[in-house]
Swiss-Prot record:
The gene is Gria4. Residues 593-608, 609-611 dip into the membrane without crossing it. This is Glutamate receptor 4. One of its GO terms (cellular component) is kainate selective glutamate receptor complex. Belongs to the glutamate-gated ion channel (TC 1.A.10.1) family. GRIA4 subfamily. One of its GO terms (molecular function) is transmitter-gated monoatomic ion channel activity involved in regulation of postsynaptic membrane potential.
Length: 902
């Protein structure tokens, strides 16, 4: 029985082979791949594998055997050699990719040898009988979209990699409709050229662009658009590409620009979904490119294998013998020897109609795609969204927008918003034990608390991300690229910036700011000068040097005037009445205001002490009165200032204002290298600030610092030879931090504010702005500043860091007074000694004594008050004989002492 069954099977197989004709069980196909097509090759291999392993024998009665070559398109000999190698292996059809350098070589060989080429590359401009174009044409869809937007003035950026078909169609339509199209070929552009072009177009107020380039060049152009900030609201870009979802547009989402494009692959269809499940399981090491979703060119590659498989099935059903000898001959023979069944293969390929990853796959008799549908996408705040579709029959059809949520922030509630900030005390700092925490809990500071408050008000989840380059945000003058936190927002890496970010015009052009949450200005930070030690004669400080000199001259002048008026006024001369028993009056009437008494009177009045003599004449009293008035005012003013000067420790600052900085060169000064302060000086038209900017720009070594901490450290280490220009809020904070050796001097140079920043046109702008206003009105912002500036200060209360500090008097404050006292006492002793010696010498001559005897007698009298030797009395001054008896009389102001003699 078993033998009979086997014979029946063999007989059936024989009849089946006769019925199907001589169709090979292994179909040889070729594959030509160019550089940077790893994902397309993976799709090619996957399609062949799935066909050959299909469990349905009716769908896969034969195996596809690929012969693959990688070609270097720049080398025409290598292209020719690869094609001839494929031809010599007896392939029935070739799947291949080309570029503008290899397209003519491949199409020429195909036409000469009747070998069909199935390609996902750009459609050729001419008619090639044996070339099947898997990629649909964009001409009709693009023109319909331009009509819909009613564009009549726009820029068309293109390269020649894909030919001129779209350019030709647009220029023809422009001529018919009167459009103004600026067509620019960007084939040989580099990054700098792109930025220069975009800047020039921006000066021309060009806001509408059509970009027709291959994916690599297209992605580069989009990056340059972002780098110059032209991806913001007000710009509109139409991308002439069939893979809208293949393009990285995250930065455009945050920028706000309108971006429209086309999508050939519908990822929601069952066939694509099934393939995606299989695609995700591929080993990335064996199948390069499988780590990312398949691009539309990879989907076209997959469909190309399906087209070839369906063609061979159709030929098999038609019993067309396509078998070839192993050696197909020389492809370079002259004349060419075409393949005999090539016409049948070409005709059958064009008759294929299947449903592939790119939708309906069907060709006309020229080998071009027909009856296809492509979706129209626009970039929304949530990502690419389908807004319509286009096909040959219906043309452009726009679908009604699906109902949106109540506000755009509702879509954000389900994801985590990236908040960019900068490590800057006291705004954002690591906690002391931050290693024990994760995420946002690692940080503390003013902006950390502010971010938490804002998130509560608008109801979002957020993640704090420290800006990698540690900069606030400035635009490079050469590359036009934004750095810092502004760059993070502009290029779509973050959605909110909560940091000490100054609101400026140039930043406002590319990002949006909320209302200011803190007001401030540019200020000057210097190293706190050492407290001046009081000098020995610090008690002289209340009056200037000039005043003291004037007082001395006034004292001398008043004394001389008093002496003169006393001499000329008869009322100052008087005669003493003699007492009973005494001699008559002196020949010279006495005048008390000699020059020395005049000096003594003026000094006593100045010292508020007075003396035993007073002027008698009216003129003398006038002199005395005005001198008393003068001394009253001077002494009162001196006393009032003396208390302050002796009880206040002063710090003498070498700089008090920006003008002081500008007019000197001994103290260097600088700003943060990237920020609004530097931009302020660069753009300022005020003479003082222009002078400062000229100095800072040319100073060597550079006075610009990478971070604020670096600038503060430079101030502290410079020994007073460097001043740092920074925001007043930061200046005030650092002044309250140990080692308490910096200080703010002068007023603010300008007035500005910090704001919360969002990308241009972001849906978060309004909610964030309202949250800041609510926090301001509720007093939360003031509480946060007091908390992080003063409550956590390390240098005592705010007033204690003032410039002048009151303290108790120390010996050094009044040491000069003691020096004068000691000096005066010493001088008095010296004068007394001189007087003693002088009078002793005079007495020795008068009494005919030796000088030593006179000294001894004088000393005995000075110490004991006893009489001299031999009963003689020594008197200091006695021009006349002494009478017997005890009496005291006045003569010339000198007291004469007499005693009874035995």
């Amino acid at each position: 029985m078993r033998i009979i069954c086997r014979q029946i099977v063999l007989l059936f197989s024989g009849f089946w082979g006769l019925a199907m004709g001589a169709f090979p069980s292994s179909v040889q196909i070729g594959g030509l791949f160019i550089r940077n097509t790893d994902q397309e090759y993976t799709a090619f291999r996957l399609a062949i594998f799935l066909h050959n392993t299909s469990p349905n024998a009716s769908e896969a009665p034969f195996n596809l055997v690929p012969h693959v070559d990688n070609i270097e398109t720049a080398n025409s000999f290598a292209v020719t050699n690869a094609f001839c190698s494929q031809y010599s292996r007896g392939v029935f059809a070739i799947f291949g990719l080309y570029d503008k350098r290899s397209v003519h070589t491949l199409t020429s060989f195909c036409s000469a040898l009747h070998i069909s080429l199935i390609t996902p590359s750009f459609p050729t401009e001419g008619e090639s009988q044996f070339v099947l174009q898997l990629r649909p044409s964009l001409r009709g869809a693009l023109l319909s979209l331009l009509d819909h937007y009613e564009w009549n003035c726009f820029v068309f950026l293109y390269d020649t990699d894909r030919g001129y078909s779209i350019l030709q169609a647009i220029m023809e339509k422009a001529g018919q409709n009167g459009w103004h199209v600026s067509a620019i070929c960007v084939e040989n552009f580099n990054d700098v050229s792109y930025r220069q072009l975009l800047e020039e177009l921006d000066r021309r107020q060009e806001k509408k662009f059509v970009i027709d380039c291959e994916i690599e060049r297209l992605q580069n152009i989009l990056e340059q658009i972002v780098s110059v900030g032209k991806h913001v609201k007000g710009y509109h870009y139409i991308i002439a590409n069939l893979g809208f979802k293949d393009i990285s547009l995250e930065r455009f989402i945050h920028g706000g620009a309108n971006v429209t494009g086309f999508q050939l692959v519908d990822f929601n269809t069952p066939m694509v979904t099934k393939l995606m499940d299989r695609w995700k399981k591929l080993d990335q090491r064996e199948y390069p490119g499988s780590e990312t979703p398949p691009k539309y060119t990879s989907a076209l590659t997959y469909d190309g294998v399906l087209v070839m498989a369906e063609t061979f099935r159709s030929l098999r059903r038609q019993k067309i013998d396509i078998s070839r000898r192993g050696n197909a001959g020389d492809c370079l023979a002259n004349p060419a020897a075409p393949w005999g069944q090539g016409i049948d293969m070409e005709r059958t390929l064009k008759q294929v109609r299947i449903q592939g990853l790119t939708g309906n796959v069907q060709f006309d008799h020229y080998g071009r795609r027909v009856n296809y549908t492509m979706d129209v996408f626009e970039l929304k705040s949530t990502g690419p969204r389908k807004v319509g579709y286009w096909n040959d029959m219906d043309k452009l059809v726009l679908i009604q927008d699906a109902p949106t949520l109540g506000n755009d922030t509702a879509a954000i509630e389900n994801r985590t918003v990236v908040v960019t900030t900068i490590m800057e005390s006291p705004y954002v700092m690591y906690k002391k034990n931050h290693e024990m925490f994760e995420g946002n809990d690692k940080y503390e500071g003013y902006c950390v608390d502010l971010a938490s408050e804002i998130a509560k008000h608008i109801g979002i989840k957020y993640k704090i991300a420290i800006v990698p380059d540690g900069k606030y945000g400035a635009r490079d003058a050469d590359t036009k690229i934004w750095n810092g936190m502004v760059g993070e927002l502009v290029y779509g890496k973050a959605e909110i910036a909560i940091a000490p970010l100054t609101i400026t015009l140039v930043r406002e052009e590319v990002i949006d700011f909320s209302k200011p949450f803190m007001s401030l200005g540019i200020s000057i930070m210097i190293k706190k000068p050492q407290k001046s030690k009081p000098g020995v004669f610090s008690f002289l400080d209340p009056l200037a040097y000039e005043i003291w000199m004037c007082i001395v001259f006034a004292y001398i002048g008043v004394s001389v005037v008093l002496f003169l008026v006393s001499r000329f006024s008869p009322y100052e001369w008087h005669t003493e009445e003699p007492e009973d028993g005494k001699e008559g009056p002196s020949d010279q009437p006495p005048n008390e205001f000699g020059i020395f008494n005049s000096l003594w009177f003026s000094l006593g009045a100045f010292m508020q002490q007075g003396c035993d003599i007073s002027p008698r004449s009216l003129s003398g009293r006038i002199v005395g009165g005005v001198w008393w008035f003068f001394t009253l005012i001077i002494i009162s003013s001196y006393t009032a200032n003396l208390a302050a000067f002796l009880t206040v420790e002063r710090m003498v600052s070498p700089i008090e204002s920006a003008e002081d900085l500008a007019k000197q060169t001994e103290i260097a000064y600088g700003t943060l290298d990237s920020g609004s302060t530097k931009e302020f000086f660069r753009r300022s038209k005020i003479a003082v600030y222009e002078k400062m900017w000229t100095y800072m720009r040319s100073a060597e070594p550079s006075v610009f610092t990478r971070t604020t901490a670096e600038g503060v450290a430079r101030v502290r280490k410079s020994k007073g030879k460097f001043a740092f220009l920074l925001e007043s809020t930061m200046n005030e904070y650092i002044e309250q931090r140990k080692p308490c050796d910096t200080m703010k001097v002068g007023g603010n140079l300008d007035s500005k504010g910090y704001g919360v920043a969002t990308p241009k046109g972001s849906s978060l702008r309004t909610p964030v702005n309202l949250a800041v206003l609510k926090l301001s009105e509720a007093g939360v912002l003031d509480k946060l500043k007091n908390k992080w500036w003063y409550d956590k200060g390390e240098c005592g209360p705010k007033d204690s860091g003032s410039k002048d500090k009151t303290s108790a008097l120390s010996l050094s404050n009044v040491a000069g007074v003691f020096y004068i006292l000691v000096g005066g006492l010493g001088l008095a002793m010296l004068v007394a000694l001189i007087e003693f010696c002088y009078k002793s010498r005079a007495e020795a001559k008068r009494m005919k004594l030796t000088f030593s005897e006179a000294i001894r007698n004088k000393a005995r009298l000075s110490i004991t008050g006893s009489v001299g030797e031999n009963g003689r009395v020594l008197t200091p001054d006695c021009p006349k004989a002494v009478h017997t008896g005890t009496a005291i009389r006045q003569s010339s102001g000198l007291a004469v002492i007499a005693s009874d003699l035995p």
